[in-house]
């Protein structure tokens, strides 16, 4: 080979220091010129004795100082030519690369090429692409372009290819190609796809992109490489001169990262961990620089490898130490309940725990580093970003969270408190702090974490309600949570329901036992008890409310509800059986004993309420779900509170609600059924600031009643108020204590049930009232009402219980119920918010009351028949309607005579209790009852039979039936008890609706405490009347009841008697069923002509809505109720708007309220239930828009 035969081909492709880089060179092989370019594969023999291998030319350069022509190549050997030899893991086309590149002078490289390689038989024989095929369609240019972009790293090889063409090398003489394993797999896959196609297909750009390789050489062989090995003798080859490896380093960089980079490569995470410390780091740095040369310089490689032997040993040592450290660290941190889950990043690099620990120990440990402020040094050791301004703090916090506990453990300082972790604003800092805190707290006190959580929960609770002790709160909260989280079977739910009924029936004291059952109830009960005390004593509702608010924060669900229901807290606590009525309540529902405790809470003490506060956090969601049921309680409580100091109490309740925001809202949802609607279903108890503002504004601006758009109306019977009512009505309840109590318990789900529960509690008081207002019909109606309530509530509760019990847990049940209840209260609240709606509701209530007075006997008969075997649905609706009417009548009745405190437990009674507005309404009702009754008398009398019939028909459609279907088992058991349950459920719903409306009416009607008082009495009477009426399913009984009621009404109160009169009672009797909610429900209310409303279909649908949806949020299926509550009902053009129109018209006119109701609402409703109110009007007036 002539010395001048070596020459560069093509233009230089790069300059760096003394080096000039080229793309190809030309030499003579066997007298023929040949060109080798970058990326070419060719066969070589390093020495005549060495096996054939494949060389890949990777770099060509000339050193200007020494004029040396050098090359860097990668060598590939067959597995059998390696020290390990071939094994089953090696592929037939596999080769193994030498780990280090070899730096060889071009003259030596040419010598390596001069050999006989004909014996090479390995590799995949690829089909060569004929040059003739490449000549067509520009495929050759495409192939060259592809090679230039991919195989030649984007370098321009046109001049090199031109030179090759000039030498006659159009057909590449490259007979071998080494691919990466992925490339090889793709290539084989492509060959399989095109196995029946000519090789020229591989020149297609798509085939090339998918892994095809177009080889133009005659006998191309395709191999792949996926592994490397250290060649034992290669470094001894004299031709290899690693000392000439190009030094391609740029300007010197910081040396600190060097060891770390080296560590990361070698697997040693911290050079400082080595005993040698910095010396090791230096060695590694040197090794790295030397090794970087070996990549291009084999001589260096030899030297470096020698140098590295000790380093490698050290590295292995370090690796073992590091592994042991990491194992011990992770194990310890896991044992102390602060496992290291994700290693954070510091300065864009993941922290090396071993490096960090070694660096810290070298500097003296955590205390020393902190005292000397050397955390930045640790950060630098970790190779963090030098520009970080929070490097020291971040590093220290990471260390505190991840390593400090272990360091203390090693040093025996485990008892030493970990540094407090401050909340951090920066993402990393905050994460680190939180992690540190968690870790620190955990390691400090393994048992402290659960404790901490409990304490945290308790702490907020105590703050919310200082009265409550943390531990009781925790315990109660825990119990509540458990109860809430444990769904009961449908059967169990039913049993619990029954238990609740029994509980409601039981004396208040005995019911107090259930406090254990439900702390939430207890909380409510505590508030109720306080309110009761307030009511019984001269305690103003405001103080009671404040007390409740104090608990409120903690009571969130219970106390919050109580504050809202504070006015009716006494009744509520007595009626806390409401939970029973609530199939959702823990007893009726497996949901949570704490909820059942709600009933228990009715009588519970403030301490209970405090306890509930403790558990409120746990019950927040549950309460939110239970809002519907609690609503009834809330309505009752609010009603009572309003009776004494309605506005203040309600406002306080809302304030408490505010304070409890999260827990309170949920509890208050009981009173504020709408809250669940406002809140997301997932978080029914949480109220948005805006919603809260609106709620408060409504509370204060709408006269408290309107301000309960979320459900404040539900607590129509405030516990305090209920207590007086109990006292007033104790005679009545005693007259039918067993029945009333049971019904109350069953009715508990609704406000009516609340009232009934209260009745059971205050049955003796009611007895006294009964003596005061001894009306056989009234007394009878009271029990009937209770029965109806019981029937209604029973089915409702059953449905509640069944619905949740069978398929869902208590939580879900509560949630669902809360939502429906929330919807109902929303609708009611909306009405209440609007003075017109308020008046309308009162008017309807008044009619119902009058009607119920006349239907007490009928209701009794109906209830009995219902108890016996009346179709639950039919009678329930009928009863429910009657019951509502009775409630309304009684609401008005009690104004003259408070004896019907019994009726207070019912929905309507609850509103009446709230009856500040009720007093007003009573006044209106009494003032305008003459005309109303006269109109109603003819209308209702004319439609009396109809109304009864219609009511029964409506009852047949009874929403309870729907409820029952909703609640799987309920429908089956609805026949007898379910009927009662359903009635109770309806009543519950009705109670909720009425209380809500009443609440709004009450606050809006507002009046003085005396009107409220009168409202209370009226409410009681109305409730009794309603119950009786609701119970009476038969037309004749209805008439009888109506007459009795009329008489009773007359006897009960001069106002009511004068207003309602016997005929009025009759008229109300018919009107009561429809008119109760006719005003509210465009369909029913509009049925001023009971005949129109009386038709089974019409009456039924209206009552269904009224009873099912209004009474029970569970009854959302009630088309009207759902619509009404969600403004959907009012959407019906005629119905909604007309309804609202009537409400608006009725509310403005105080004295002519009755007339308005009669003339506008009843006639319209009677004739065109749906056309009663235009949808637009309703929507515009509907308070929902406010929310």
From Swiss-Prot:
Keywords assigned: Activator, DNA-binding, Isopeptide bond, Methylation, Nucleus, Phosphoprotein, Transcription, Transcription regulation, Ubl conjugation
Any GO CC annotation of this UniProt entry: nucleus
Stretches for region Disordered: 251-279, 413-611, 891-977, 1032-1065
PTM sites of type Phosphoserine: 264, 1032, 1132
Keyword Nucleus attributed: yes
Transmembrane intervals: none
GO biological process: adipose tissue development; positive regulation of DNA-binding transcription factor activity; regulation of transcription by RNA polymerase II
Location(s), subcellular: Nucleus
Task performed by this protein: Transcription coactivator that binds to the 5'-AATA[CT]-3' core sequence and plays a key role in adipogenesis and liver development. Acts by forming a complex with phosphorylated PHF2, which mediates demethylation at Lys-337, leading to target the PHF2-ARID5B complex to target promoters, where PHF2 mediates demethylation of dimethylated 'Lys-9' of histone H3 (H3K9me2), followed by transcription activation of target genes. The PHF2-ARID5B complex acts as a coactivator of HNF4A in liver.
Residue ranges constituting the ARID domain according to the UniProt record: 319-411
Biased composition (Low complexity): 460-469, 527-537, 1055-1065
Cross-link Glycyl lysine isopeptide (Lys-Gly) (interchain with G-Cter in SUMO2) per UniProt, renumbered positions: 130, 446, 494, 496, 767, 774, 803, 810, 893, 916, 920, 935, 988, 1000, 1013, 1055, 1069
Modification after translation, per record: Methylation at Lys-337 prevents DNA-binding. Demethylation by PHF2 promotes recruitment of the PHF2-ARID5B complex to promoters.
Pfam families (alphabetical): ARID
Compositionally biased tracts (Basic and acidic residues): 447-459, 512-522, 1036-1048
Highest classification ranks of the organism: Eukaryota, Metazoa, Chordata, Craniata, Vertebrata
Chief place where the protein resides: nucleus
The protein's name in its UniProt record: AT-rich interactive domain-containing protein 5B
Family of this protein: Belongs to the ARID5B family.
Record comment regarding domains: The ARID domain mediates the interaction with DNA.
GO molecular function, one term: transcription cis-regulatory region binding
């Amino acid at each position: 080979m002539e010395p001048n035969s070596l020459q560069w081909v093509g233009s230089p492709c790069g300059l760096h220091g003394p080096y000039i880089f080229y793309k190809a060179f030309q030499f003579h092989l066997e007298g023929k010129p040949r060109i080798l370019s970058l990326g070419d594969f060719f066969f070589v023999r390093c020495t005549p004795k060495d096996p054939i291998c494949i060389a890949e030319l990777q770099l060509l350069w000339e050193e200007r100082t020494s004029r040396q022509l050098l090359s860097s190549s990668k060598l590939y050997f067959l597995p059998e030519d390696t020290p390990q030899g071939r094994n089953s893991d090696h592929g037939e086309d596999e080769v193994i690369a030498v780990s280090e590149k070899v730096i060889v002078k071009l003259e030596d490289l040419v010598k390596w090429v001069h050999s006989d390689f004909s014996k090479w038989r390995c590799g995949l024989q690829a089909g060569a692409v004929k040059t003739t095929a490449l000549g067509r369609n520009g495929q050759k240019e495409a192939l060259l372009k592809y090679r230039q972009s991919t195989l030649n790293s984007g370098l321009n090889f046109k001049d090199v290819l031109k030179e090759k063409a000039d030498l006659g090398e159009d057909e590449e003489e490259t007979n071998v190609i080494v691919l990466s394993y992925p490339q090889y797999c793709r290539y084989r896959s492509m060959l399989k796809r095109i196995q029946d196609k000519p090789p020229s297909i591989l020149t297609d750009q798509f085939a090339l992109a998918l892994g095809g390789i177009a080889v133009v050489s005659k006998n191309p062989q395709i191999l792949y490489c996926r592994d490397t090995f250290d060649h034992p003798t290669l470094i001894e080859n004299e031709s290899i001169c690693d000392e000439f490896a190009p030094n391609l380093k740029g300007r010197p960089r910081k040396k600190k990262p060097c060891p770390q980079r080296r560590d990361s490569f070698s697997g040693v995470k911290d050079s400082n961990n080595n005993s040698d410390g910095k010396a090791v780091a230096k060695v590694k740095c040197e090794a790295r620089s030397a090794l970087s040369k070996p990549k291009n310089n084999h001589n260096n490689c030899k030297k470096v490898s020698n140098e590295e032997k000790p380093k490698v040993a050290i590295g292995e040592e370090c690796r073992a130490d590091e592994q042991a450290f990491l194992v011990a660290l992770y194990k310890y941190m896991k044992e102390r309940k602060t496992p290291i889950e994700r290693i954070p990043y510091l300065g864009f690099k993941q922290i090396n725990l071993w490096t960090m620990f070694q660096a810290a120990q070298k500097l003296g440990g955590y205390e020393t580093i902190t005292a000397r402020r050397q955390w930045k040094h640790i950060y630098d050791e970790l190779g963090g970003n030098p520009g970080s301004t929070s490097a020291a703090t971040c590093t220290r916090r990471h260390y505190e969270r991840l390593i400090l506990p272990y360091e203390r453990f090693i040093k025996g300082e485990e008892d030493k408190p970990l540094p407090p972790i401050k909340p951090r604003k920066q993402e990393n800092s905050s994460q680190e702090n939180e992690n540190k805190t968690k870790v620190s707290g955990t390691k400090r006190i393994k048992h402290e974490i659960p404790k901490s959580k409990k304490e945290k929960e308790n702490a907020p609770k105590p703050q919310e309600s200082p009265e409550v002790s943390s531990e009781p709160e925790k315990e109660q909260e825990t119990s509540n949570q458990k109860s809430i989280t444990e769904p009961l079977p449908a059967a169990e739910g039913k049993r619990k329901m029954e238990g609740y009924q029994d509980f409601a029936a039981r004396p208040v004291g005995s019911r107090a036992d259930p406090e254990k059952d439900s702390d939430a109830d207890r909380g409510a009960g505590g508030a109720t008890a306080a309110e009761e005390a307030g009511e019984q004593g001269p305690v103003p509702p405001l103080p009671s409310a404040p007390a409740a608010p104090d608990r409120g924060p903690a009571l969130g669900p219970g106390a919050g509800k109580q504050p809202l229901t504070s006015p009716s807290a006494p009744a509520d606590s007595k009626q806390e059986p409401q939970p029973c009525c609530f199939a959702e309540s823990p007893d009726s529902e497996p949901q949570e004993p704490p909820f059942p405790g709600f009933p228990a809470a009715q009588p519970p003490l403030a301490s209970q309420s405090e306890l509930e506060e403790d558990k409120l956090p746990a019950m927040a969601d549950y309460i939110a779900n239970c809002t519907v049921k609690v609503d009834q309680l809330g309505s009752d409580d609010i009603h009572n509170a309003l009776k004494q100091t309605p506005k203040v109490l309600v406002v306080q309740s809302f304030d408490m609600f505010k304070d409890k925001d999260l827990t309170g809202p949920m509890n208050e949802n009981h009173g504020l059924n709408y809250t669940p609607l406002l809140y997301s279903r997932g978080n029914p108890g949480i109220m948005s600031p805006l919603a809260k503002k609106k709620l408060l504004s409504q509370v204060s601006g709408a006269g408290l009643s309107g301000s309960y758009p979320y459900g404040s109306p539900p607590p129509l019977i405030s516990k305090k108020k209920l207590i007086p009512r109990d006292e007033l009505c104790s005679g009545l309840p005693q007259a039918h204590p067993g029945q009333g109590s049971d019904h109350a318990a069953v009715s508990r789900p609704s406000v009516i049930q609340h009232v009934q529960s209260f009745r059971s509690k205050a049955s003796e008081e009611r007895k006294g009232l009964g003596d005061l207002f001894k009306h056989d019909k009234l007394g009878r109606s009271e029990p009937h009402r209770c029965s109806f309530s019981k029937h209604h509530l029973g089915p409702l509760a059953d449905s509640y219980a069944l619905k949740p019990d069978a398929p869902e847990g208590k939580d879900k049940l509560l949630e669902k119920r809360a939502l429906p209840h929330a919807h109902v209260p929303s609708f009611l609240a909306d009405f209440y918010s609007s003075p017109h709606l308020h008046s309308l509701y009162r008017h309807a209530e008044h009619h119902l009351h009058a009607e119920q007075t006349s239907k007490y006997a009928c209701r009794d008969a109906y209830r009995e028949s219902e108890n016996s075997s009346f179709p639950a649905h039919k009678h329930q609706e009928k009863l429910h309607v009657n019951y509502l009417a009775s409630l309304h009548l009684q609401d008005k009745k009690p104004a003259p005579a408070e004896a019907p405190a019994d009726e207070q437990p019912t929905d309507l009674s609850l509103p009446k209790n709230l009856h500040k507005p009720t007093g007003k309404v009573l006044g209106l009702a009494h003032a305008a009852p003459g005309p109303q009754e006269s109109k109603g008398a003819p209308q209702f009398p004319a439609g009396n039979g109809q109304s009864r019939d219609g009511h029964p028909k409506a009852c047949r459609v009874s929403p309870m039936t729907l409820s029952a279907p909703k609640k799987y088992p309920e429908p089956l058991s609805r026949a007898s008890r379910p009927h009662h349950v359903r009635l109770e459920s309806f009543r519950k719903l009705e109670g909720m609706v009425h209380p809500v409306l009443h609440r709004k009416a009450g606050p809006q009607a507002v009046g003085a405490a005396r009107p409220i008082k009168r409202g209370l009495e009226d409410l009681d009477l109305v409730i009794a009347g309603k119950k009786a009426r609701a119970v009476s399913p038969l037309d004749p009984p209805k008439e009888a009841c109506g007459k009795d009621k009329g008489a009773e009404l007359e006897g009960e109160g001069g106002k009511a008697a004068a207003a309602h009169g016997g005929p009025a009672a009759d008229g109300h009797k018919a009107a009561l069923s429809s008119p109760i909610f006719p005003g509210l429900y465009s369909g029913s209310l509009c049925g001023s002509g009971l005949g129109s409303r009386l038709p089974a279909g019409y009456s039924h649908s209206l009552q269904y809505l009224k009873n099912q949806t209004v009474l029970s949020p569970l009854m959302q299926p009630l088309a009207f109720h759902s619509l009404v509550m969600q403004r959907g009902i009012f959407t019906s053009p005629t119905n909604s708007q007309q309804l609202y129109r009537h409400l608006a018209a009725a509310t403005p006119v105080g004295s002519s309220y009755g007339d308005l109701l009669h003339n506008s609402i009843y006639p319209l409703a009677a004739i065109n239930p749906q056309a009663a109110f235009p949808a637009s009007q309703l929507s515009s007036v509907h308070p929902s828009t406010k929310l």
